[in-house]
Structures are given as structure tokens and as C-alpha cells.
């Protein structure tokens, strides 16, 4: 069921600020902290990493955030927070969740761990409801799920192939360690939200210079596909995604016989990322949107972490 009607009002003008912590200080963590800092509904109280010399910790300090190189242990010692973002790795998140679960904090997982409830805002809605662990699937999942969901709701799709390409210099260590988990989590999400069981997922890490802007290409088998009808469905889905990720666009959409090909590009809208790092931008934008919606939830009980 699509809950996209709620997206227009997903960022209320007045909300009670939610205290948050971020675990992970790589490129995705830096951009996440930047987006949180711009959000009137979120108050970043702690950024936790492992390397005291990391650029991510230095950046967080420059924004006035409390920082630590003690990782999850520091978050547990300083808790409770309203929201904890985990921007580490799938394996690390599996270790973190049993420690965070008893705290009652909303955990937003940006790794392909498959531990929590999958969220793609324009498909599932942005409210966390009663879930305490929300999983953002993957960058390719955030780019592809809205389109494959819309296609399958309108046409008899029999096969889906999702090929995403990211620039090498924004594919960090965790991304490279998570390749198997990425394929599994993205495939699971595509099948879950499209109902199509025959699915193939590919992730390319491109060393091209200049760096390649993040792209996701979707190939779909749709009997007797009508090009105009397909394009209309895809454009509507893309417009909804742009409500929270404005750099999301449809570059091409073709239909010939039973083969539909859709090319999506995401340009980062970020204070810290290069424009080609749309893979990080789209998943972070979705994560912040989930947190903002949670902050605005009626009856939410606030928690207090370390002072900023």
C-alpha cells in the first residue's frame, strides 16, 4: 500500500525537537550529520566513530556536535536518544541492534543488514509506526523501489533487473564489504514491493574520471508495453521521490516489444558531497525524512542524550 499522500506534509513547520546520535563517520555519516544540522526538527547530540582523526568527526565538531571515537559504547553510555542513525556496515549493525533494542530508541539503519522494517518513503510511507528498527535498504533500493513498485502496480511485470553504478571514490570500505548484503537486501526489497520473484541486482563501482554520477538502470519485462503509459507511471513515481530527494530524475524511459528500460540519475543536493554522490544523498534524505516524521509524531515521549 502506498502512503505517499503524507509526504507533502512530512516536514511540519513546528515540531518538538528529537535528539539524535549518529554512528559512523565516513562520507555517508558526514552528509547525514550535515542534513541533520539543517533540520529544524532534529538535534544532533552525538557523533560516534572509531578513528579519532577521521574527517567525519572533525566535520561534526565544526558544526558544534559532541563527538567520540568510542563508537557504539559511547552511544550506549550517553543514551537515551530519540533516534540513533547507524551508518556503519551490515555486520556492525547486527552487533549494534541487540544493544540498542532495549533502550526503546528509534534506530534508523542505513546499512543493508535486513534486520529492521524496510522503508522507501514514497512506497511505505515515512512514519515509523511501532517499528523500533527501520531499514533504508540500500542506495539502489531507494532509487529503484519507487519505480518498480509503480510499474508492477500498473503492468504485468514478469522480470526485473536493477543495475546501479556508483563512483569509486564515494564507495567506501563499508560499501565494498557490504556487496553481498547489498545484492541480497536490494533484491529482497524489489521483490517485496513489486511482487516480482524473478529479479537480478547488480552494483557497479566505477573508477571513471571524471567520476560517474549515481545511476540506476531498470530493465523490466512487460508484455505489450505501451511506451507512453509506462513513461507516465515512471514520471509520477519520480515526482514523488523529488519531494524529499530533489536531485532524482528520469534520464530515459523506453519500451520496445516486451522490454522496458528506465534510466534514473540522482544528483546529490548536499553541503559536503560532490554532485555525483547521489547514492549517498538519496538514502540520507530518506533517513532524515523518517526521523523528522518521527519527531512530529503526536504523543511521542522525548528522551534526552548528552548535552550539545
Curated annotation (Swiss-Prot):
E.C. numbers: 1.2.1.10
Q: Where is the active site?
A: 139
Q: Which GO terms describe its biological process?
A: catabolic process
Q: Which residues bind NAD(+)?
A: 25-28, 279
Catalysed transformations (reactions):
acetaldehyde + NAD(+) + CoA = acetyl-CoA + NADH + H(+)
**What Gene Ontology terms describe what this protein does at the molecular function level?**
acetaldehyde dehydrogenase (acetylating) activity; NAD binding
Sorted keywords for this record are:
Aromatic hydrocarbons catabolism, NAD, Oxidoreductase
Q: Which family does it belong to?
A: Belongs to the acetaldehyde dehydrogenase family.
What the entry lists under HAMAP family is as follows: Ac_ald_DH_ac
Protein name per its UniProtKB record: Acetaldehyde dehydrogenase
UniProt source species: Streptomyces griseus subsp. griseus (strain JCM 4626 / CBS 651.72 / NBRC 13350 / KCC S-0626 / ISP 5235)
Q: What is the lineage of its organism?
A: Bacteria, Bacillati, Actinomycetota, Actinomycetes, Kitasatosporales
Amino acid at each position: 500500500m502506498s502512503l505517499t499522500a503524507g509526504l507533502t506534509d512530512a516536514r511540519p513547520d513546528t515540531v518538538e525537537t528529537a535528539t539524535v546520535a549518529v554512528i559512523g563517520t565516513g562520507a555517508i555519516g558526514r552528509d547525514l550529520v550535515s542534513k541533520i544540522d539543517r533540520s529544524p526538527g532534529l538535534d544532533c547530540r552525538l557523533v560516534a566513530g572509531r578513528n579519532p582523526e577521521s574527517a567525519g568527526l572533525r566535520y561534526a565538531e565544526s558544526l558544534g556536535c559532541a563527538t567520540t571515537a568510542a563508537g557504539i559504547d559511547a552511544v550506549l553510555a550517553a543514551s537515551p536518544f530519540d533516534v540513533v542513525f547507524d551508518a556503519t556496515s551490515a555486520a556492525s549493525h547486527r552487533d549494534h541492534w541487540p544493544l540498542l533494542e532495549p533502550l526503546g530508541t528509534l534506530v534508523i539503519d542505513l546499512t543493508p543488514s535486513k534486520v529492521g522494517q524496510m522503508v522507501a518513503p514514497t512506497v511505505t510511507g515515512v512514519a515509523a509506526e511501532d517499528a523500533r528498527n527501520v531499514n533504508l535498504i540500500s542506495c539502489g533500493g531507494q532509487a529503484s523501489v519507487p519505480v518498480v513498485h509503480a510499474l508492477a502496480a500498473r503492468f504485468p511485470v514478469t522480470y526485473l533487473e536493477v543495475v546501479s553504478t556508483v563512483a569509486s571514490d564515494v564507495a567506501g570500505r563499508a560499501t565494498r564489504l557490504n556487496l553481498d548484503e547489498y545484492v541480497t537486501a536490494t533484491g529482497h526489497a524489489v521483490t517485496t514491493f513489486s511482487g516480482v520473484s524473478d529479479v537480478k541486482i547488480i552494483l557497479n563501482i566505477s573508477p571513471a574520471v571524471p567520476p560517474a554520477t549515481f545511476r540506476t538502470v531498470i530493465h523490466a519485462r512487460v508484455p505489450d508495453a505501451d511506451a507512453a503509459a509506462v513513461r507516465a507511471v515512471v514520471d509520477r513515481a519520480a515526482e514523488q521521490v523529488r519531494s524529499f530527494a530533489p536531485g532524482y530524475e528520469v534520464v530515459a524511459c523506453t519500451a520496445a516489444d516486451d522490454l522496458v528500460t528506465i534510466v534514473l540519475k540522482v544528483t546529490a543536493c548536499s553541503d559536503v558531497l560532490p554532485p555525483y554522490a547521489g547514492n549517498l544523498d538519496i538514502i540520507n534524505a530518506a533517513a532524515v525524512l523518517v526521523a523528522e516524521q518521527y519527531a512530529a509524531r503526536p504523543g511521542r515521549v522525548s528522551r534526552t542524550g548528552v548535552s550539545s
